[in-house]
Amino acid sequence: VQVSGPSGVCLGAAEFDRCIGFEDIPTAGAFTVFDHSRDMFEVARNYVHFFQHESCGFCTPCRVGTSLLKHLMDKLHQGCGSPYDFAEIEKLNQLLQTMSHCGLGHTACNPVLDTIARFRPAYE
C-alpha cells in the first residue's frame, strides 16, 4: 500500500497493523493498493520518472538529483546495476533531503528506499 502518494510511505503486508495518523504514518488522504501482480520495482521507477519530470529545476540538487536517480533506476531496469548503485541511491537521498529547496526533492528517493527495504527481491 502506498500511503500519501508517490512521496509518502510504501508499506508491505506485514505492516498493515500500523496506525494511520501523525503519531505513526501521516497521510494526506491518498492510498494506492497494489496486488501481487504489480512489480514494485516498476512502481518505484514510475514514481522516480514522475519526480524527475515534475522537478521545477529551481534548485540544482533536485534538478540534477532526480535526473541521476532516474538514470540509476533505468540502469537497474536494464540489468546493468551493481551494489554500488544502491550506495549511490543512499547518497542521493542524503543530498536531496539536506540540499533541496522543496518537498519534492526532499522525498524523491522515498519510493525507491521504501521498496528496496520492503520488496528487495523486486530489485534482483
Per-segment meaning from a language model:
Residues 1-124:
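Redox cofactor-anchoring modules in respiratory/redox and cofactor-processing assemblies
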